[in-house]
Amino acid sequence: MATARRVARVAELIKREVSQILLSEIKDDRVGAGMVSIVDVEVSNDLQNARIFVSIYGDETAQHQAMEGLAAATPFVRREIGQRLSLRRVPTVVFLQDRSLERGSRVLALLNQLRPTFEAKAQTGVEEPLENTAEGEENPSGGE
């Protein structure tokens, strides 16, 4: 079992090498059509499994095609990792789509939709702002 420091170092090396492989070595048009970028790599403590999280820019069809292309390229990527890194055993590689950027942009869009409501309430003074009260003093609005 590898130390946490070694696991993190191997994950970073795999991330760097796979990014380079995706950029220059994979000729599959499906992978290039979706603008694939590596978000994170998680390596198991025994260094046997590597989960590579990718973010794919594009519509749903391009994302699906890019994931199919990555699945087809997985044996090639694993072989390249084995040749480029000096590891006793080459980890099994799995590509997973990271949708956190999509969720984050959806949350930001929702917040932007709510902004006019909050600004209108702030201008009309509908909601009372919190008052600074020292500890032990009674709140003038009657609340505790």
Swiss-Prot record:
Top-level division of the source organism's lineage: Bacteria
Stretches for region Disordered: 121-144
One term of GO molecular function: ribosomal small subunit binding
Amino acid composition bias (Acidic residues), ranges on this chain: 128-138
Pfam family, one: RBFA
Keywords for this protein: Cytoplasm, Ribosome biogenesis
GO cellular component terms, semicolon-separated: cytosol
Role according to the record: One of several proteins that assist in the late maturation steps of the functional core of the 30S ribosomal subunit. Associates with free 30S ribosomal subunits (but not with 30S subunits that are part of 70S ribosomes or polysomes). Required for efficient processing of 16S rRNA. May interact with the 5'-terminal helix region of 16S rRNA.
Subunit structure and binding partners: Monomer. Binds 30S ribosomal subunits, but not 50S ribosomal subunits or 70S ribosomes.
Name of the protein in question: Ribosome-binding factor A
Name of the gene: rbfA
